[in-house]
């Protein structure tokens, strides 16, 4: 948020900046959006990590006249109808790049466990598509939930999910995570199990 505050200083038309953190809880994130609209904000830039579950709240903000810009993870819907515009990231490309790295560093193939944020988020779903495209026709196999094991990008939940996966799958060769801090905290569980 410090970087955002610095950027806002460069824009004289922004007179007040509010910040909210849904803390990985969809109901809190929805309440935060509603609260911002109730405060009378003119614009809302929002990371809808819960994906399509956020669309009704974003649509309501847009219909209330708030410039509404979700970014990175798509909430579904249509720009100009459900929100002002969407600023995206090419997550499939990220997944393809990870796949190339995996082929180079684990060339014999193996079992891949993928961790991502909340269930249904477009980031993890698109990254998985990119991974699958990159690894097609190879000896790699995805294990765990499809498209990924949901962690909510929460370090504690990531540790819980990884511990359960280690107990369930005796051989995990590659762990893919799209949120480093979450994975780092979970690696202690992996080390303890050998």
Model-derived regions, located:
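A residue-level marker of the well-folded mature domains of exported/periplasmic proteins
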Residues: 1-194
């Amino acid at each position: 948020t410090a970087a955002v505050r610095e950027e806002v200083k460069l824009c004289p038309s922004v007179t007040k900046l509010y910040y909210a953190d849904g803390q990985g809880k969809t109901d809190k994130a929805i309440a935060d959006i509603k609260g911002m609209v109730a405060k009378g904000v003119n614009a809302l830039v929002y990371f809808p990590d819960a994906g399509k579950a956020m669309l009704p709240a974003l649509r309501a903000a847009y219909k209330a006249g708030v410039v509404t810009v979700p970014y990175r993870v798509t909430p579904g819907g249509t720009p100009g109808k459900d929100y002002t515009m969407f600023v995206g990231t090419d997550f499939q490309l990220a997944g393809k790049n990870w796949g190339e790295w995996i082929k180079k560093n684990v060339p014999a193939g193996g079992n891949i466990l993928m961790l991502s944020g909340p269930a249904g988020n477009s980031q993890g779903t698109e990254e998985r598509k990119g991974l699958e495209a990159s690894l097609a026709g190879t000896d790699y196999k995805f294990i765990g939930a499809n498209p990924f094991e949901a962690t909510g990008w929460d370090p504690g939940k990531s540790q819980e999910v990884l511990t359960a996966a280690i107990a369930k799958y005796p051989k995990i060769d590659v762990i893919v995570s799209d949120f480093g801090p979450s994975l780092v905290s979970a690696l202690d569980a992996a080390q303890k199990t050998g």
